[in-house]
């Protein structure tokens, strides 16, 4: 929306300069090199850095004054311009300011340039200040500067097949827009930096998030190799399984129908087979056949399990098996996922194209997907993950004596929990008891209800209630911590991690019980999940620095919540394992040991 009260390029006096020859570029370099802070931006031909070619470079060092250097399309000519500015980008004394600077970092890597020195990313700064809001520049400019930026769509048209490339426009049409980007980014930095200080987020920003940018940039640009033959095999196997399940479902239903249609599934289950007396219906009178509803009815008929299996396999096929080959970059032969640093509300990384965080690990079919991720030719796949880090953080935060003792003694925490709840010796604990204790451990610390626990364990509500009571009796510190967490958020309005990352939870004072309950669970969960995210980020930064310092050629390739994965040269095997485990275990001093488990193999599945 155009807001009459907002300033814009049309209303604000500004000095934006277009530079299109080497002589002027050299002169600009000499001027910029004397400055301590440099705001930068790149204009390119693609939003995917791996394939992006430079169209122009923008710089700003004073507010409302910026420069745009047009880059020729011929690569050799382009490199002449880039090389003029290379010593500027690589000068460790000059701070670099950017909006989503990881992208510019990657694009410049394509031209043999690696940004050095302190970096300030306005997107990440705002993510720490207000995790749940938008962090794009157009939004930030409106909120913090009351300024309406030139939107890229105004230049190249709306997204779609007719959208132009920046390359198609004359530099004279582009330079004001591009220079504005660098200028606004600098102005945003000047507004956001004091806010980081005010909210005690400086340490998290400068020591954790910003040093992580180069780590992620290298992971994204390096990409991951995929075993396409293994993927084809998985595709054939899963498709055959689907056909079999389909046949079985038709048999049980006594007729064939479209299993992918919720409406038809509802009519078969509730209309024809009458699995329950009073099935749930939507406003339009259609039967509800959501995952949640079907999970609750599993014991009623074998057809339900089969329908759930069918849906799971179908999703696996479409999300991963059939889409992974399409994501392989034709030039590099690898997939290059994006690791997003400013998306989740808890501080965890997320990934997209493909979403590596969502590959199911609990079922055998999901695990097969991991078999298709392989190391670089001649290398081994190495996987290291934190052992029960969330419970260890809980032990640290709650200072519960029983939980702390179990971890310090190196006991199996779930067996130890079972032993305490059922007053058994740890050696007498059965598998079934351990499984229940495990469900309790992870469920209860995230505020699971009696009903939720009963469902998850497939037991009566009465027994679930007893288990929760026994659990809190066993770990009184945990109960106290949970109450205290909620109290803190009620007072402050936000939860905090060990590194002072914030998560705002205004709903904790809501009059609606469901909404309030959700916020209360997050008050308990956010410090745990957020601290886990902080810790693994610190480990990643330290591992990356040590690989560099010790001249390790092996590479970190995938991060998933509490695990790190590497492609490793055989001759570096021992060294890599030692560095990774050491840095993961020493990333933060909890009052219980941090433990990392390591595994090797020829692919992700074998190593994990």
What are these regions (language model features)?
Residues 1-73, 90, 99-101, 132, ...:
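Conserved "right-hand" nucleotidyltransferase catalytic core of DNA-directed polymerases
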Residues 77-93:
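Short, basic/hydrophobic alpha-helical segments
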Residues 91-99, 108, 370-394, 405-438:
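Conserved catalytic alpha/beta cores of large enzymes that bind or transform nucleotide phosphates
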Residues 97, 261, 347, 385, ...:
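Hydrophobic, well-ordered secondary-structure elements that form the walls
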Residues 109-119, 133-138, 400-404:
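A short alpha->loop->secondary-structure connector
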Residues 114-130, 144, 410-414:
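Conserved beta-strand -> loop -> alpha-helix junction used to position metal-binding or nucleic-acid-contacting
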Residues 164-167, 214, 221, 329-332, ...:
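Conserved catalytic core of nucleic-acid polymerases
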Residues 543-597:
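C-terminal structured "cap/appendage" subdomains that terminate the fold
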């Amino acid at each position: 929306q155009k807001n009459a009260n907002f300033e814009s390029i049309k209303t604000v006096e500004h000095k934006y300069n277009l530079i299109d020859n080497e002589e002027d570029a050299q002169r600009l370099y000499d001027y910029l090199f004397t400055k301590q802070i440099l705001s930068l931006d790149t204009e390119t031909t693609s939003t995917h850095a791996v394939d992006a070619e430079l169209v122009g470079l923008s710089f700003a060092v004073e507010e409302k004054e910026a420069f745009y250097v047009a880059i020729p399309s011929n690569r050799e000519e382009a490199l002449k311009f880039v090389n003029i500015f290379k010593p500027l980008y690589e000068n460790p004394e000059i701070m670099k300011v950017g909006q989503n600077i990881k992208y510019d970092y990657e694009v410049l890597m394509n031209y043999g340039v690696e940004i050095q020195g302190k970096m300030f990313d306005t997107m990440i700064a705002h993510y720490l200040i207000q995790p749940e809001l938008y962090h794009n520049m157009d939004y930030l400019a409106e909120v913090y500067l009351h300024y309406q930026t030139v939107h890229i769509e105004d230049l190249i048209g709306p997204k779609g097949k007719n959208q132009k490339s920046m390359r198609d426009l004359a530099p004279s049409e582009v330079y004001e827009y591009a220079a504005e980007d660098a200028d606004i980014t600098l102005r945003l930095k000047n507004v956001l930096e004091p806010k980081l200080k005010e909210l005690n987020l400086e340490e998290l920003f400068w020591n954790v998030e910003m040093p992580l940018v180069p780590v992620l940039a290298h992971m994204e640009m390096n990409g991951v190799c995929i075993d396409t033959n293994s993927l084809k095999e998985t595709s054939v196997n899963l498709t055959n399984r689907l056909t079999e399940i389909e046949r079985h479902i038709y048999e049980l239903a006594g007729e064939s129908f479209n299993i992918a249609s919720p409406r038809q599934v509802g009519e078969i289950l509730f209309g024809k087979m009458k699995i329950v007396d009073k099935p749930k219906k939507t406003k339009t009178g259609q039967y509800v056949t959501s995952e949640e509803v079907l999970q609750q009815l599993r014991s009623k008929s074998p057809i339900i399990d089969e329908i759930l299996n069918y849906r799971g396999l179908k999703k696996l096929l479409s999300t991963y098996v059939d889409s992974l080959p399409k994501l392989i970059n034709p030039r590099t032969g690898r997939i290059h996922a994006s690791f997003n640093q400013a998306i989740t509300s808890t501080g965890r990384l997320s990934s997209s194209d493909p979403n590596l965080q969502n590959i199911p690990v609990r079922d055998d079919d999901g695990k097969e997907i991991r078999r298709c991720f392989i190391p670089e030719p001649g290398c081994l796949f190495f996987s290291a993950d934190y052992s029960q880090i969330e419970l260890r953080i809980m032990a640290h935060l709650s200072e519960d004596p029983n939980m702390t003792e179990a971890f310090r003694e190196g006991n199996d925490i779930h067996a130890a929990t079972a032993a305490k709840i059922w007053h058994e010796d740890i050696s007498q604990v059965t598998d079934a008891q351990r499984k229940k204790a495990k469900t309790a451990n992870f469920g209860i610390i995230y505020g699971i209800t009696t009903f939720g626990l009963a469902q998850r364990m497939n037991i009566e509500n009465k027994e679930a209630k007893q288990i929760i009571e026994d659990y809190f009796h066993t770990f009184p510190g945990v109960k106290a911590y949970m109450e205290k967490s909620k109290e803190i958020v009620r007072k402050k309005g936000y939860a905090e991690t060990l590194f002072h990352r914030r998560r705002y939870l205004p709903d904790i004072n809501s009059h609606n019980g469901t909404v309030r309950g959700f916020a209360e669970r997050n008050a308990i969960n956010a410090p745990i999940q957020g601290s886990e995210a902080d810790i693994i980020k610190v480990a990643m930064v330290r591992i990356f620095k040590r690989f560099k310092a010790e001249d390790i050629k092996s590479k970190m390739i995938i991060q998933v919540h509490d695990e790190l994965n590497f492609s490793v040269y055989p001759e570096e095997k021992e060294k890599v394992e030692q560095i990774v485990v050491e840095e993961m275990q020493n990333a933060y001093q909890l009052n219980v040991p941090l433990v990392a488990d390591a595994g090797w193999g020829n692919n992700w599945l074998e190593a994990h």
